[in-house]
């Protein structure tokens, strides 16, 4: 779970309390092992994020996410499987995770790479 993620377990009550004063709706949120939730995503009540799933940054997740799938957007929609994501981006894998590079060392390394090593959208 990255920075700015909000996990909501209830909501919607204020809009109907003029008709039903004690109205409150709750839903448990479950985040399974190895799930990744991108920055500033909103996870709504009752949602399960499946094992190994990826939620793109800024997504609003209103429905459960199956295991090993990638979702994104508002509302979050299916993009691809995690395996398809890996295959699509494998050529851009710079393999620097876990090398304990300082920010200065990482910057120096990245500046030595040719342009085609970087992901383009």
Residue ranges of model-derived segments:
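Short, glycine/charged-enriched secondary-structure capping and boundary segments
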Residues: 22, 69-70, 84-87
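Acidic, glycine-centered active-site loop in nucleotide-sugar glycosyltransferases
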Residues: 66-67, 72-75
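Short-chain dehydrogenase/reductase
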Residues: 36, 54, 70-71
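Flexible, glycine/small-residue-enriched loop-and-beta-strand segment within the central core
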Residues: 1-48, 75, 81-83
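Beta-rich strand-turn-strand
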Residues: 39-55, 59-63
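Terminal amphipathic alpha-helical/low-complexity segments used for targeting or macromolecular assembly
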Residues: 74-121
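Short acidic capping loops at alpha-helix termini that bridge into adjacent secondary structure
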Residues: 33, 51-52, 67
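Hydrophobic alpha-helical segments of small multi-pass membrane proteins
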Residues: 1, 27, 57-60, 70
């Amino acid at each position: 779970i990255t920075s700015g993620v909000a996990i909501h377990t209830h909501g919607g009550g204020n809009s109907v309390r003029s008709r039903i004063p004690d109205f409150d709706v709750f839903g448990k949120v479950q985040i399974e092992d190895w799930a990744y939730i991108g920055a500033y995503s909103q996870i709504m009540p009752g949602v399960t994020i499946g094992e190994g799933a990826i939620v793109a940054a800024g997504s609003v997740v209103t429905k459960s996410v199956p295991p090993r799938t990638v979702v994104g957007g508002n509302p979050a929609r299916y993009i691809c499987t995690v395996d398809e994501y890996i295959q699509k981006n494998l050529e851009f894998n710079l393999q620097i995770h876990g090398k304990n590079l300082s920010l200065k060392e990482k910057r120096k390394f990245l500046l030595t790479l040719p342009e085609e090593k970087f992901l383009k959208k």
